[in-house]
Swiss-Prot record:
Protein known as: Superoxide dismutase [Cu-Zn]
Binding site for Cu cation: 47, 49, 64, 121
This enzyme's EC code(s): 1.15.1.1
Known catalytic reactions: 2 superoxide + 2 H(+) = H2O2 + O2
Cofactor binding remark: Binds 1 copper ion per subunit.
Residues the record lists as binding substrate: 144
Database matches in SUPFAM superfamilies: Cu,Zn superoxide dismutase-like (SSF49329)
Chief site of localization: cytoplasm
InterPro entries per the UniProt record, alphabetical: SOD-like_Cu/Zn_dom_sf, SOD_Cu/Zn_/chaperone, SOD_Cu/Zn_BS, SOD_Cu_Zn_dom
Gene3D superfamilies in alphabetical order: Superoxide dismutase, copper/zinc binding domain
């Protein structure tokens, strides 16, 4: 079992953690998040970005992690970036908790996401359905108010 965590924060009141767990290299990864301080009753994009570099804030994290050269999509789509996690949904206080299982995201092997950055976006991810070139790259999820590098945990 490999476990990893990203402590998410930035130049906003959005903060929290995203925990990853994977039993075997070919097995699925469980992703659990607890994010607070976002807009109330909203859907907000969350992605794994290529670089674990936050020296210039969350912008240094680069584009979505996309080792297979696919277009942007929903977490459940066959055609998507590995880093596409879709939207998290916030409650009336702007908080979001949830768990999903994903077959593309890996902690073990050459496409591991360890050392990369989780970004919580300011806008709703259109899941690549926005009919624009930008939609196919980013989902038009907007600014990056909070992020954190994924690190190995006990």
């Amino acid at each position: 079992m490999v476990k990893a965590v990203a402590v998410v924060r930035g130049d906003s009141k959005v903060s929290g953690s995203v925990v990853f767990e994977q039993e075997t290299e070919n097995g699925p990864t469980t992703i659990t998040w607890d994010i607070t301080g976002h807009d109330a009753n909203a859907k907000r994009g969350m992605h794994i970005h290529t670089f674990g570099d936050n020296t210039n804030g969350c912008t240094s994290a680069g584009p979505h992690f996309n080792p297979h050269g696919k277009t942007h999509g929903n977490r459940t789509d066959e055609n998507r970036h590995v880093g596409d996690l879709g939207n998290i949904e916030t409650d009336a206080q702007g908080n979001s908790k949830g768990t999903v299982t994903d077959n593309l995201i890996k902690l073990i092997g050459p496409e591991s996401v360890i050392g990369r950055t989780v970004v919580v976006h300011a806008g709703t991810d259109d899941l690549g359905k926005g009919d624009t070139e930008e939609s196919l790259k980013t989902g038009n999820a907007g600014a990056r108010p909070a992020c954190g590098v994924i690190g190995i945990s006990a």
